Every structure is written in structure tokens, then in C-alpha cells.
């Protein structure tokens, strides 16, 4: 159990050692603010928005894989001019005890004074003494300047109790803590309360998307100076997705005609496809992968139409879950969805390679469903 010893509250001293509750050394790379590559594009419109994080207890930067979340927050943190406690989370952490051991060490590394006597033992890494959370919150609440804590890849934390404990500390730390979550999914925190109280800063996928001007800057940093209309076309095709733009630029560097390449490249046979299939599709269970491949034959779809293509009565919850995960499934409202255009293109190629002959059958099923539901023009399209 991660615990706190009974000492006078006024005592100060080294709060954490240099080993985690299992006796292994803390991985220092997890506390380092990530370095920005030479081709990184600073985006003042987003760093200005992030400045609001200093005035709200909670900030959430929520976007898809490769949306540029981490580098954006790293750039903001590096230019802040004050200490930032940074922790990159990992999926293999063994429960809340290990998480809080790393949080304490992140705060300690950033120079945040912590109560003496906080420590951990390897017997109970899945548990946290509530007194530790209360003492930490009380210590933070008494600070003149708030501690800034960035939790990167927060979506990797699976234990619901971790979110509950984090909410307890955030609530009771008051003005002494500014928490920034960088995540692919919405955390299990009472976000509605923070929104209603105007106590939350949010940056989401739509805002993270590159503008044509930002895309042109990124391309230029890769040695590609293209006309404005070419940058706009690439942004339209990629949806302004940061990783898609960067991977396209890297590939175009090898082409004798970069402008034509960026206009006509086959997404299904590119490094973009490799990224999406590994980072998005590969992380899903087999039934969800199958659903994604099957709905890729459609421009838009709802739960019932997806059920007709997959035979799965749980198609609706699967789609809603993909949307919450920022898994390149976009909510059109009224229970209709669509795939990110580039993602849909790649899935279509993957479907034809994996299941030759299935695509025409899926089109027939979709047409039957659409006719039965009065959507004849779409069925004939």
C-alpha cells in the first residue's frame, strides 16, 4: 500500500525516494517534457488557449492518435517559465499505488515541496492510503503558486479508482493545483461539473486540426514549398490530422513531383496506413475491427445500418465507444456517424485485401436496408 507515516504536518523533507513501490528505479524518461523535433510547427492560437489552464483547475487536451496533443502541451510547458511536473503514463502500471508513486515523484522532480513521511511498500501497489491523498491535497492547497501537473497519455490508465482519487485531490487542492490531462478518450471525471462552473479548459480534435496555413508551414519545414491551394487540398483530405500531414510530407520528400504526389497518393499503401492500422485498428478487439472494415463501404451510417452489415446487435454501443475514443469515427448527430475520410479510404483498401469479394455483398446489404427504410436515392448511389 502506498502510505503516509504519522508525523507532524509541519515536517518537511524528501517525500519520495528513487525507487518505485516494487523497488525498481523510477524511469526518468517518464518525467521529461518531450523534445520538439526540428520540423515542429508552433501554433500560437493553441498555446494561447492553453494559457487559460493557469486559471482553471482542470484542462483536457483530447484528440485522436497523432493529433499533436503531446507536442502541443510540451511546447506550451517549455515556454511557460515556471516548473511543470510531467508524467507520461504507461499501460503496464500495476494499479493506483504505482500511479501515485509516479505522480509524487513527478511533483518532487519539478521541485514541489511535499510532506515528509510519504512512501511506498511493495506489498500493496494496487492500494492507496486515503490519508496520503488528503495530506497531498492539503499540502497543495496551502501553496502560494499552484503546482502544474501534466498527465500525458492519461487514457492508458484503466483503473476507475485512479480517476476517483485524482478527482478527490484536485477538488481539495483548490487553487494549489492545475491539472492538465492529455488523452485520447474522455477521463472518468465529473467533467460536467467543471464545465458548468467554468473551471475547465478544453482543446479537442476540431481545434487540434491544422489550418491550411499551419499545414503550409509544416510542409515548408520539410523542404516542400507548395501553392496555397495544394496545402488546402491536403488539409481537406487529411482533415488537418497532424500525423497524416507529417507522414505525407516525409513521403513527398522522396517524390520527383511532391505536389502531384500529395494530391494523388494512395493512402491505403502508405506510411499513414501503417500508422492507423497499428495505432487505431490494431488496438481494437476483433469484433470492432470487423465493424470498422465493414462500415468503410459507406459514406455515413447509423447503428441499425451497421447492424445490417455486421449482424451485430451491439453495433450501436460499439460505434458510440469508438466515437468517445477519438478512433476516427465522427458523430454527425441524430445517431449517425462517418469515418474520417482518410481512415475510411485506408480501411476500404484493407477490406479488399483481407476479404476479396466482400465489398459488393456489403453494398447489396446496405442497399436493401436503405430501400426498406425509404432512402431510395442513397440506395441507388
Locations of the language-model features?
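C-terminal boundary/linker of central alpha/beta nucleotide-binding cores
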Residues: 1-16, 58-67, 73-78, 142, ...
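Alpha-helical sensor/transducer elements of the RecA-like P-loop NTPase core
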Residues: 2-12, 16-25, 29-33, 42-46, ...
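Pre-Walker A adenine-sensing motif
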Residues: 38, 42-52
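Conserved catalytic network of the ASCE P-loop NTPase/AAA+ motor domain
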Residues: 52, 138-143, 170-176
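Short, amphipathic alpha-helical segments that act as regulatory/interfacial helices
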Residues: 58, 100, 104, 108, ...
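Conserved phosphate-binding/catalytic loops and adjacent sensor/switch elements of nucleotide-binding enzymes
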Residues: 65-67, 71-147, 156-158
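Walker B catalytic acidic pair
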Residues: 152-153
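Leucine-rich, amphipathic alpha-helical/linker segments
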Residues: 358-381
Amino acid at each position: 500500500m502506498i502510505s503516509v507515516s504519522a508525523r507532524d504536518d509541519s515536517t518537511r523533507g524528501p517525500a519520495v525516494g528513487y525507487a518505485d513501490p516494487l523497488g525498481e528505479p523510477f524511469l526518468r524518461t517518464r518525467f521529461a517534457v518531450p523534445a520538439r523535433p526540428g520540423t515542429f510547427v508552433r501554433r500560437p492560437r493553441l498555446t494561447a488557449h492553453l494559457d487559460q489552464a493557469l486559471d482553471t483547475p482542470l484542462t483536457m487536451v483530447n484528440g485522436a492518435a497523432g493529433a499533436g496533443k503531446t507536442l502541443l502541451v510540451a511546447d506550451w510547458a517549455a515556454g511557460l517559465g515556471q516548473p511543470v511536473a510531467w508524467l507520461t503514463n504507461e499501460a503496464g502500471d500495476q494499479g493506483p499505488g504505482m500511479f501515485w508513486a509516479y505522480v509524487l515523484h513527478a511533483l518532487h522532480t519539478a521541485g514541489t515541496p511535499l510532506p515528509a513521511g510519504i512512501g511506498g511498500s511493495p506489498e500493496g501497489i494496487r492500494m492507496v492510503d486515503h490519508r496520503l491523498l488528503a495530506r497531498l491535497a492539503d499540502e497543495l492547497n496551502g501553496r502560494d503558486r499552484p503546482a502544474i501537473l501534466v498527465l500525458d497519455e492519461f487514457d492508458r490508465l484503466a483503473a476507475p479508482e485512479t480517476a476517483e482519487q485524482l478527482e478527490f485531490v484536485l477538488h481539495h487542492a483548490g487553487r494549489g493545483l492545475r491539472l492538465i490531462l492529455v488523452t485520447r478518450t474522455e477521463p472518468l471525471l465529473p467533467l460536467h461539473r467543471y464545465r458548468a462552473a467554468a473551471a475547465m479548459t478544453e482543446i479537442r480534435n476540431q481545434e487540434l486540426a491544422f489550418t491550411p496555413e499551419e499545414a503550409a508551414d509544416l510542409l515548408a519545414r520539410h523542404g516542400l514549398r507548395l501553392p496555397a491551394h495544394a496545402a488546402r487540398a491536403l488539409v481537406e483530405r487529411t482533415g488537418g490530422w497532424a500525423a497524416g500531414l507529417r507522414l505525407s510530407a516525409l513521403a513527398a520528400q522522396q517524390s520527383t513531383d511532391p505536389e502531384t504526389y500529395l494530391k494523388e497518393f494512395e493512402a491505403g499503401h502508405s506510411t499513414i496506413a501503417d500508422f492507423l492500422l497499428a495505432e487505431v485498428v490494431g488496438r481494437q478487439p476483433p469484433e470492432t475491427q470487423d465493424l470498422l472494415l465493414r462500415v468503410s463501404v459507406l459514406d455515413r451510417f447509423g447503428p441499425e445500418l451497421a447492424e445490417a452489415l455486421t449482424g451485430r446487435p451491439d453495433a450501436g454501443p460499439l460505434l458510440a465507444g469508438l466515437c468517445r475514443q477519438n478512433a476516427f469515427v465522427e458523430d454527425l448527430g441524430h445517431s449517425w456517424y462517418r469515418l474520417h475520410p482518410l481512415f475510411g479510404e485506408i480501411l476500404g483498401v484493407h477490406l479488399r485485401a483481407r476479404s476479396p469479394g466482400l465489398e459488393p455483398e456489403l453494398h447489396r446489404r446496405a442497399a436493401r436496408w436503405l430501400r426498406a427504410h425509404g432512402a431510395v436515392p442513397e440506395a441507388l448511389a
